[in-house]
A protein has these predicted regions:
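Structured-RNA-binding interfaces characteristic of tRNA pseudouridine synthases
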Residues: 1-230
Length: 230
C-alpha cells in the first residue's frame, strides 16, 4: 500500500527514506491517493516541498531508482507551482481491476481468477448507471476520513483483452475507501445472476454497504492514471 503504517513497509515510507537520504534532510512525500495493501499503481503521483538550490531532476530520478526497492520505480520528477497538491489538485483518477477466466499461473499475483461464467453484457449494462449517479455510500467501507460520499464517475466499463481476460475500468474525480473493490464485487454478482439489474439499482440508490457485493481482493486492482488540469 501507499500510506505509512506501523509494522509494515509502504511506498510512502520507502520514498521518504530514499529522498531524505539523498537530500540530507527529513522529507515528507504526499501521494495522490491511499492505495490499500496489495493494490498496485502504474502511475501514482506524489509531491514533496523543497527549499534550496535547484535540483537536478534527471539525476535525482536516477539516484532514487538506484536505492529504492525493486518493486518501486520513479518515472519522472518535475517542478510544479507552489500551490500544487498531489491529492487535492488531481482532476481525476483511473483504476483497472483485472480478472481471468482460465487458470494462468503468471496472472495470479495481478489478476483474479473467476471459476464461474459471467455475463459481461449485463455487467456493462449495470455499470453504465454509474455515469448518472453521484452518491456512493453503498460502496464505501466504514472508518474512512471521507466528509462526503459524492463522486463523479465519468467512465465505467468492462474491457475484454483476450478470450479469457478482462478488466474493469473506472474513472472519477475521487474515490471512497474500498469503493472500486466493492463496485467490482457488486457487478460480478450481476454477472453471475445473483442480483437483477433492478436490485442493482436499488442498491445503488438506497443501499448500504451490507447490501452491496463483497470487496474483491486487492492484488488485481491497479491505479492506472492520475490526471491534473495544468
Amino acid at each position: 500500500g501507499w500510506q505509512i503504517q506501523p509494522n509494515a513497509n509502504s511506498v510512502q515510507q520507502e520514498l521518504q527514506k530514499a529522498l531524505s537520504t539523498l537530500l540530507r534532510r527529513d522529507m515528507e512525500v504526499v501521494g495522490a491517493g491511499r492505495t490499500d495493501t496489495g493494490v498496485h499503481a502504474r502511475k501514482m503521483a506524489a509531491h514533496f516541498d523543497w527549499e534550496g538550490e535547484e535540483l537536478d531532476a534527471p539525476q535525482l530520478t536516477y539516484r532514487l531508482n538506484r536505492i529504492l526497492p525493486r518493486d518501486i520505480a520513479v518515472k519522472d520528477i518535475k517542478r510544479v507551482a507552489d500551490d500544487m497538491h498531489a491529492r487535492f489538485s488531481a482532476s481525476s483518477r483511473t483504476y483497472h481491476y483485472y480478472i481471468h477466466t482460465c487458470k494462468d499461473p503468471f496472472e495470479r499475483h495481478y489478476s483474479l481468477q473467476m471459476n464461474f461464467p459471467l455475463d459481461f453484457d449485463r455487467m456493462n449494462q449495470a455499470a453504465r448507471h454509474f455515469l448518472h449517479h453521484k452518491d456512493y455510500a453503498a460502496f464505501c467501507k466504514a472508518g474512512g476520513d471521507n466528509k462526503t460520499t459524492l463522486c463523479e464517475v465519468t467512465q465505467a466499463k468492462w474491457v475484454q483483452t483476450s478470450p479469457s481476460t478482462w478488466y474493469f475500468e473506472i474513472t472519477a474525480n475521487r474515490f471512497l475507501r474500498n469503493m472500486v473493490r466493492a463496485v467490482v464485487g457488486t457487478l460480478i454478482d450481476v454477472g453471475r445472476g445473483k442480483i437483477s439489474e433492478s436490485q442493482f439499482l436499488d442498491i445503488l440508490h438506497n443501499g448500504t454497504r451490507s447490501d452491496a457485493g463483497e470487496s474483491m481482493p486487492g492484488h488485481a486492482l491497479f491505479l492506472e492514471e492520475v490526471r491534473y488540469d495544468l
